[in-house]
Curated annotation (Swiss-Prot):
GO molecular function: calcium-dependent cysteine-type endopeptidase activity
Name of the protein in its database record: Metacaspase-1
Disordered as annotated region, ranges: 1-95
The UniProt record lists the keyword Protease: yes
C-alpha cells in the first residue's frame, strides 16, 4: 500500500526530531493539535465501501475471519515447535557480553491497533479499518487480551483523540510501552500506506528508511522507522514482548530490528550482487520502454548501494539496534515490495493481516518458522508480496510462537 507516484514519499518531509515528550497517560482527553496543522476530518466515510462499526466494544465485537481448511497447514517440512521460549537470560556472541530475555507473555497485555483508510483522498484504501476490527477480535478471542487494554485509532471514529493523526499515533505508541515489565506482551498493528525516505543516519544498507503515513501526513509528515524504534523498542526492559505487525508497503524492516530471518530460519545477510542485478534490470527495462527518468533513477540507486556497501557496517548497526527485550516484527512484504489492499471472502482486507489471522486460527500451535512459511504459502496463490520476520535479538525460529 503505497500512495506516492515516485519511489520515495509524498513530499520529502523531514523525520520527527526525536520522540515526543512524555505523556502521563493515553486517556488524557482529545488533542486538537492537528486542527491547527490544517487537517480537516471528512464528514463521514463513503457508504457501503467497508464494514462500518462506530463502536469497538465487547457487546459489538468484529466478526471473526472465516474458518476452513486451506491445504497449507502441514508444517511437517518445517517441524512442530520444539517447545515454549526458554526462561532466563540468553547470551550470544563470543566474548560479546550481549544478553537478552524471551517473554513468556504471562504478564499484562496491551495492544495498539491503527487502521487508516484515507477517506476522500485519491489514494483511499478499503481494508485497513476491517483489519483493525479483525485483529482486535482475534486478540480478545484467542490470545487473552481485554477490550479495555486495546487502543484503536481509525479514521472513521467520532472521538478526535482516536483518529490516526501523527500526533495521536505517537502518543498512543508511548502509551503502549509505558511502565512495561518483564513477561508483558504488547502488540502494535498498523494497516495503511507505507513508503520510503532517504536514510540520514547511515543505518540502512539500501539507503532508505521505511515510513508509515498518518491520516494527516500532508500537514504533519510521515513517521520514520528510526523514530518508531526509539519510541517502542528502546524503552522496553529485558523479557518484555512487543509483537509489531505492519500491513503496508515497503515495510520489511519498518521497526528497524537488526535480525531479519529467511524461510529457512537463518539470518539474512545483505546481498549486494542480487540488489545490483535488480537495479540494473529495472534500468534496462525502463530504457527499452523509453522511460529515461526511470532508467536514471534505477542506476542512481545502484550507485548509492555500491557506495554505501563500504560505509554501512552491519555489525555496528546490529549493536546499535539490538534490544534485550523480546521484540518481533512481522511485515507484509519486503522493503522494496508493495502490500496488497485486497478482498477475501467478499470483504476488503489487507492481505498480510488476513493471512496472519487465518494461519494462526487454523493452526494455533506453530513455530515462528512455520508461521512465516505458512503466511508466505497462503499469499503466494494470489499475491507477489513476501512477508518478512525480524527480531531485536538472535531468535530461535523453532520455538512456539506466542504473543
Amino acid at each position: 500500500m503505497f500512495p506516492g507516484s515516485g519511489h520515495n514519499t509524498y513530499g520529502g518531509y523531514p523525520p520527527p526530531q526525536g520522540p515526543p515528550p512524555n505523556n502521563n497517560g493515553y486517556n488524557s482527553g482529545p488533542n486538537n493539535s492537528y486542527r491547527q496543522q490544517g487537517y480537516s476530518r471528512p464528514q463521514g466515510p463513503p457508504p457501503g465501501q467497508y464494514d462500518q462499526q462506530s463502536q469497538y466494544s465487547q457487546q459489538s465485537q468484529p466478526s471473526a475471519p472465516p474458518q476452513g481448511g486451506t491445504g497449507y497447514g502441514d508444517q511437517s517440512q518445517w517441524g512442530r515447535p520444539t517447545g515454549p521460549p526458554p526462561s532466563g537470560s540468553q547470551s550470544f556472541g563470543q566474548n560479546s557480553g550481549y544478553t537478552f530475555q524471551y517473554s513468556n507473555c504471562s504478564g499484562r497485555k496491551k495492544a495498539l491497533l491503527v487502521g487508516v483508510n484515507y477517506f476522500g483522498s485519491p489514494n483511499e484504501l478499503r481494508g485497513c479499518i476491517n483489519d483493525v476490527k479483525n485483529m482486535s477480535s482475534f486478540l480478545v478471542d484467542h490470545w487473552g487480551y481485554q477490550w479495555n487494554d486495546i487502543v484503536i485509532l481509525t479514521d472513521d471514529q467520532n472521538d478526535i483523540s482516536r483518529v490516526p493523526t501523527k500526533n495521536n499515533i505517537i502518543r498512543a505508541m508511548q502509551w503502549l510501552v509505558k511502565d512495561a515489565r518483564p513477561n508483558d506482551s504488547l502488540v502494535f498493528h498498523y494497516s495503511g500506506h507505507g513508503g520510503t525516505t532517504a536514510d540520514t543516519d547511515g543505518d540502512e544498507e539500501s539507503g532508505y528508511d521505511d515510513v508509515i503515513y498518518p491520516v494527516d501526513f500532508q500537514q504533519a509528515g510521515h513517521i520514520v522507522d528510526d523514530d518508531m524504534h526509539a519510541i517502542m523498542v528502546r524503552p522496553l526492559p529485558p523479557g518484555c514482548r512487543l509483537t509489531a505487525l505492519y500491513d503496508s508497503c515497503h515495510s520489511g524492516t519498518a521497526l528497524d530490528l537488526p535480525y531479519v530471518y529467511s524461510t529457512k530460519g537463518v539470518v539474512k545477510e545483505p546481498n549486494l550482487l542480487k540488489d545490483a542485478g535488480s537495479d540494473a534490470l529495472n534500468a534496462f527495462i525502463s530504457y527499452e520502454r523509453g522511460n529515461i527518468g526511470g532508467a536514471i533513477s534505477s542506476l542512481t540507486g545502484l550507485v548509492k548501494k555500491v557506495a554505501r556497501q563500504g560505509s554501512t557496517n552491519q555489525d555496528q548497526v546490529r549493536q546499535a539496534k539490538f534490544s534485550a527485550a523480546d521484540v518481533i516484527s512481522i511485515s507484509g512484504c519486503k522493503d522494496d515490495q508493495t502490500s496488497a489492499d485486497a478482498k477475501e471472502n467478499g470483504r476488503a482486507t489487507g492481505a498480510m493481516s488476513w493471512s496472519f489471522i487465518k494461519v494462526l486460527n487454523e493452526l494455533p500451535n506453530q513455530s515462528y518458522l512455520s508461521l512465516l512459511n505458512n503466511m508466505r504459502t497462503i499469499l503466494a496463490a494470489k499475491y507477489s508480496q513476501k512477508p518478512q520476520l525480524s527480531c531485536s535479538h538472535p531468535q530461535d525460529m523453532n520455538i512456539q510462537f506466542i504473543m
